[in-house]
Amino acid sequence: MSNGNSYNHHHQFPMSIPISCSSHSIQSQSRMNTLNANRDLLSPGNDVIVTRTVSPSFYSHGMPARDNVFRKDDHVRILGNTTDPAWYRARNANQEEGLVHADCVVRINGQAYDNGIVRMRASGCDVAPGAASTTSSTSSHHSTAANHQPWFHSMISRENTEKLLRGKPDGTFLVRESTNFPGDFTLCMSFHGKVEHYRIEQTSGGQLTCDKEEYFSNLTQLVSHYKRDADGLCHRLVTPIICETATFSSNGSSSFGSSSTVDLEDRTSVFRHAGLVISSNDIDVGDTIGHGEFGDVRLGTYKNRKVALKVSKRHGNGMLDSLLDEAKFMVGLSHPNLVTLVGVVLDDVNVYMITEYMANGNLIDLLRSRGRHALERRQLMMFAMDICQGMCYLESKQIVHRDLAARNVLLDDDLVAKVSDFGLAKKANSQSHDSASGKFPIKWTAPEALRHSQFTTKSDVWSFGILLWEIFSFGRVPYPRIPIQDVVRYIEKGYRMEAPEGCPPEIFKVMNETWALSAQDRPSFGQVLQRLTTIRNTV
């Protein structure tokens, strides 16, 4: 494709085995019949799926190079024809343009593209004539499970949804049952003053998808995925609109969590012992500067120093426990490349976790906004080394981060990179097994961690390799053309991503070393840092 592609042609897997066709078969009458039959399907604006990866012998004379031809299972939109009646111009969701052969495509779900549903692009309307619905039993299962989530609003109308979301910060969201597609759901999100609606479609097997590329077993997994990265949506999911009618457990507490005063005292004693409890009178709370998993992030001032305040209500939204757990894990950590915990505020109507203020935001946003024209290779190397030094410190403390990615790296005034977001961190010798329910980012997590919950510092090393790929690709989403549910299977069959465009070979070698299938074959963070130091002095 014109923007490059991330597949490694040296690692074959079932979905991309080239199919050879003789020149005689191309000219056969049956093929011409197929071309004629597909004429309506190939009208500009239609969405199709590529059914086969064709080999160079399948090309007409003078056609472009192989990388300009879409591959098996790509979802593309037809742009128009070419001088060769067998070939059509098309574009995928990443805005990459290329070619498809007329008898190597089929309709999506057996239907021509309908303007009412734009794949991975909010249309403002979730109505598509003739769209099939899934079984009520599967829908009921998903609805029942989702009732325990604060962002699920069941049968709320579209009109009331827009009243709740309109004017809210970008990324504020809720999930509701679809009124026009019984059995499906709708993801609704505020963006640039408007409300965008994404249809969540159920497959015949009960899986859920927004784009027919990423599939999820339940709504919780889907929401967790899009909280980590927009991955084609207009914005990543940030702050849920809490449903006031959420179900309650048998003991009377909200199914998405509440905390008694006594329990809160017990769980915050670690901060008191560490001298990290700060009076609300000593904090000046300023404007909202972001939105995180727990709620708003606000700018504040403490002792004439700018700080960031993560805010959680004391009761009713189920996020207080997570905020306190993250803050508790940060107690005692001290390194120039880790975001520093300043303290917690417990005597306010809200609970605040106070950290140092990082003026340049997160790394993924900076990579994508500035790009290769503004960020020199030397700066990319500094990001990599900063992060690696922070991870060396965690390695020495036998702490596993478990969510290492560019989105969880923050940058200070001087663009020093610091690892943040310790919500999933644990001690390396911990016996907890909690990899279920979509908590962990599949494309960043080592295969043994996903398969067997084996989280070690070596699984963090794997994630660091993915982070390196993010840095040198200037913020691309890893495995951009592989469905999320297939990533582990491809990795175990030997597939690895190609080097990003312009990536130094020495850096790509480090990436591949961190992606050794066996955890014991991966280098330690100390060894990775030594390699990066050598590369920095030579590149």
Swiss-Prot record:
Residues annotated to bind ATP: I289, G290, H291, G292, E293, F294, G295, D296, V297, K310
Tissue: Expressed predominantly in pharyngeal muscles in procorpus, metacorpus and terminal bulb. Expressed also in some neurons (ASE, ADF, AVA, AUA, RMDV and BAG) in the head region, anchor cell, vulva, cells around anus, body wall muscle and gondal distal tip cells.
Highest rank taxon of the organism: Eukaryota
Keywords: ATP-binding, Kinase, Magnesium, Manganese, Metal-binding, Nucleotide-binding, SH2 domain, SH3 domain, Transferase, Tyrosine-protein kinase
Enzymatic reactions: L-tyrosyl-[protein] + ATP = O-phospho-L-tyrosyl-[protein] + ADP + H(+)
A Gene Ontology term for the protein's cellular component: plasma membrane
Free-text function comment from the UniProt entry: Non-receptor tyrosine-protein kinase which plays a role in pharynx function by regulating pumping and the orientation of pharyngeal muscle fibers, independently of src-1 and src-2. May phosphorylate and thereby negatively regulate src-1 and src-2 activities.
Biological process annotations from GO: embryo development ending in birth or egg hatching; larval feeding behavior; muscle cell development; nematode larval development; nematode pharyngeal pumping
PANTHER family the record matches: TYROSINE-PROTEIN KINASE (PTHR24418)
Location of the region described as Disordered in the Swiss-Prot/TrEMBL record: 129-148
Comp. bias (Low complexity): 131-146
Name of the protein in its database record: Tyrosine-protein kinase csk-1
Family: Belongs to the protein kinase superfamily. Tyr protein kinase family. CSK subfamily.
A Pfam match: SH2
Gene that encodes it: csk-1
EC number(s) reported in the record: 2.7.10.2
